[in-house]
From Swiss-Prot:
GO terms for molecular function: single-stranded DNA binding. This is Replication restart protein PriB. HAMAP family: PriB. The gene is priB. One of its GO terms (cellular component) is primosome complex. InterPro entries: NA-bd_OB-fold (IPR012340), Primosome_PriB/ssb (IPR000424), Prisomal_replication_PriB (IPR023646). Coiled coil: none annotated. Homodimer. Interacts with PriA and DnaT. Component of the replication restart primosome. Primosome assembly occurs via a 'hand-off' mechanism. PriA binds to replication forks, subsequently PriB then DnaT bind; DnaT then displaces ssDNA to generate the helicase loading substrate. It comes from Pectobacterium atrosepticum (strain SCRI 1043 / ATCC BAA-672) (Erwinia carotovora subsp. atroseptica).
Length: 106
């Protein structure tokens, strides 16, 4: 059985983070990360772009989430999983295990 599930994605927070606490007392922070880059594929440059929903769960990860706002640049390390929305549609979500703030140089 193959069990590798790792994703590292950098980008800019493009939707206001939503902070909630589950009924079991676990804090969660949800936001959307927009990624834009130039990648090489088959020897040619191409533009890569995506918007990835991110969820950060647990007490130990919440300290960094308080400084996250729209426009914050981040690198997120974690794993992906499928979440089903109320509308019945499934979407891929990045579950953050490590978040690094990117210094904008200002």
């Amino acid at each position: 059985m193959v069990t590798m599930n790792r994703l590292v994605l950098s980008g800019t927070v493009c939707k206001t983070p939503i902070r909630k606490v589950s009924p079991s007392g676990i804090p969660h922070c949800q936001f959307v990360l927009e990624h834009r880059s130039t990648q090489e594929e088959a020897g040619l440059s191409r533009q890569a772009w995506c918007r990835m929903p991110v969820i950060v769960s647990g007490l130990s990860s919440q300290a960094v989430t308080h400084s996250i706002t729209v426009g914050t640049q981040l690198t997120v390390h974690g794993f992906i999983s499928c979440h089903q929305g109320r509308n019945g549609l499934s979407k891929i979500v990045l579950h953050a295990e490590q978040i690094e703030l990117i210094d904008s140089g200002d």
